[in-house]
Amino acid sequence: MEVIRSFFNTIRTLFRAFRSRLATLINRIAYKITSLVTGKRKADELFHSYRQNKKAARNWWEDNVDVNSKYYRPIVTVWKTIVYGVVAFALYIFCVETNFLWLMGSMPSVEDLQNPKVAQSSEIYTADGIMIGKFYTENRTPVPYKQISPNLVKALIATEDARFYRHSGIDYKAMASVAWGIVTGATDRGGGSTITQQLAKKLFKTRKSGARGLLGYVPGLGTLIYKTKEWLTAIKLERNFTKEEILTMYFNTVDYGNNTYGINTAAKSYFSKAPDSLNVQESAVLVGLQKATTTYNPIRNMKRSLERRNVVIDQMRKYGYLTAKQADSISALPIELKTKFETPYDGNANYFKNAVVDFVKKWGDENGYDLYTDGLKIYTTIDSRMQEDAEEAMTQKMKQLQRVFEDHWRNQNPWRDEDGNEITDFLPTVVKRTSKYRALAAKFPNNPDSVSYYLNKKDTMTVYDWKNSGEMKKYWSSMDSLDYYKRILRAGMMAMNPQTGQIKAWVGGLDYNYFKYDAVKQGKRQPGSTFKPFVYTTAIDDSSFNMNPCDEIVDKPFEKTYEEDGEEKVWKPRNATGTYTYAPMTLRRALAQSINSVTAELTDQVGAANVVRYAKKMGITTPLKAVPSIGLGPFDVSLYDMVAAYGVFANNGTYTQPILVTKIEDSNGKVIEEFQPEHRQAISEESAFLMLQMLRAGVEEGGGTSGSIRWRFNVTLNGNQLGGKTGTTSNNSDGWFMCVTRDLVVGAWVGGDDRSIHFRTTNLGEGAKTALPIVGAFLEKVYKDKSIEPGPFPKPSFKISKTYNCPTQWAPAASDSLGIEGDSTPAKRNEEDEFLIGPPPIPLDTSKRN
């Protein structure tokens, strides 16, 4: 018996010790919660008062309560219920706050509370400070409190939280009202959530699955837990921020529908105004919209939006922000919207923006930044005026060229094989490369008839309208659409400052909304004769050859037997005219007049491998083979690389890597990184100068293939000097023009979406007729706008040791078309090129068609 009594005494002692420690723990929890709500100083005062009152209450209890009274047990029961309830509540709050045993889900940390983060739009700016694009998951640009209209603040407080300035995050009176409404069945008691609680929910996503614990999935209990989190977070927000800061965060966080987040974007999207310019009725519309962005959307449901706006106005009257007369007057007004919703590819420079996005995403992956959520400010290199000029030039000249192309083919199909015969299965073959075909083939794997049916099924669609540079509605099938788009010529243009590498204009196509493929960097096509300068640079710069522009090579047929991939081949290029002078010709003249035979002979002398080496040194990054025809540009290159490589000539032989972005700032305006281009000496300064003179000869001297830019466009102001090189590939599949000035290197490419789509005659399809007009029109606009000042190339600061002043004798300007794999069959002569002085207007630019 004594053993049993001892055992029970031990258990009682342990229980008392546990109860004592539990009481201490509960006291600590209660103290922390009280500190959280009231602050440490106030909590100390309360707990000191509590201890004194507790002692006094105990003394009073012992002196006045009769333990034998019939009321003693009920009083004790009530008292214990209160005490245990408080203890249970304290334990519950502790578990929620600490996510005890992962039951309750996470709470925002102190760092989260002090530096709340919302997804912000990243903005792209031009070199002259104009914003040209925003990229985001949520289109949001925060504004400070001073840029928020007082009308918005009044409307929000009157509608959502009338006692906002009198509570500390939780409106107990409103909560009691809601509770009473639940008991009585009343439905007009409001929601009870304060503005601060709503902000807590929006900022920290307290109801998302990631914030739930194990108990969060229990019906009813889950609601209680996330509500508790919002209460606790609201209290913390009130302790960390002023009322103005809370309102500012709220307005910058709210979703206003139509992928519009924050009051700044909402004001601009719905009313084309800054948020500090919103009047009462506009403010009421936006505050009312917060309740349900679909139901009360003024675009989708004007009637419901108007009703909701008037509810907000009535609340403003109720709480004294408006007089009854003002409220009645405003309520009678209609909602007048002036919508302008932003998309990432609004405006111009869309191909450039896409290139910037690719660059920043890669940079962000390496540096821990997200383009779509971190509110970056990205400062780019393009000049807004030059970009506009470039797009206008592209639109104007391609519209004219497309008219010529349509007239040229009339009712015939333009897809032709190398012999000029129509490719009869062209569209059925091409359609198999489309996503539409792949989707249908997957849906009907063994049913080609069904695939064909849906490909030829007509429906209303919106397509690109090249005649008006816009869009048009057509009742077409997918095959009709493919047929239409394949007939449209494509183009790209890029302009770069050769000294800084800064890209000043980038036009990757006709319209980004319809032609996503970027002809500047993504597109790679044969450069034709624009590749020839690499041959001449090799001959002049490489000390093994040490040639000069006045050295001569006989213009005669060239033939080369060589081996490629184990197979013996014979290459016999022909001149574009199909004729030869059989006389010595200077390198200067040969390049200016784009003589294929001389280039082929020079390539043979310097070696194809050396030409490849120099092309790589100067910036060509695509694969090149050391074959005899390398000098005539048989391998695909990008316009981007070609512009960079030609920049070497204008930058004293130094290759400067093209750059798109100069610096990136964070959302607070702090510079994260500044970008500088790579520089390397590719060729000597003297070689660069000599090549520049040779390129000038192509523009300035008789017979030069680029000469038309001087008399067709006003680009020689102020003694302006240009160097240029045209290029045209076999069958006129590609037209190129590369132009060098003292401040800009500009390149353009024109061709069909497929190489089999082209002009039949060099007279219409050569680079001088397709690509050169785009560059000429661009430079004319740039000089007219005074984006840059025209002028001569700077004189060399060093002695020129080689002879270069051997002007080309007068000769008819030849085409630059290549017959890379052809024989010496004469080509059709371009009659228009016979006129070098005062030539007649070229139909390409002067024809007027409706």
Regions found by a protein language model. Give the residues of each.
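Residue-level preference for non-acidic, small/hydrophobic
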Residues: G129, L156, L199, I246, ...
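Short, well-structured active-site flanking segments
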Residues: Y165-M175, Y261-N264, T323-D328, D541-D565, ...
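Active-site loop and adjoining helix of the penicillin-binding protein/serine DD-peptidase-beta-lactamase fold
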Residues: E230, A234, E238, Q290-R308, ...
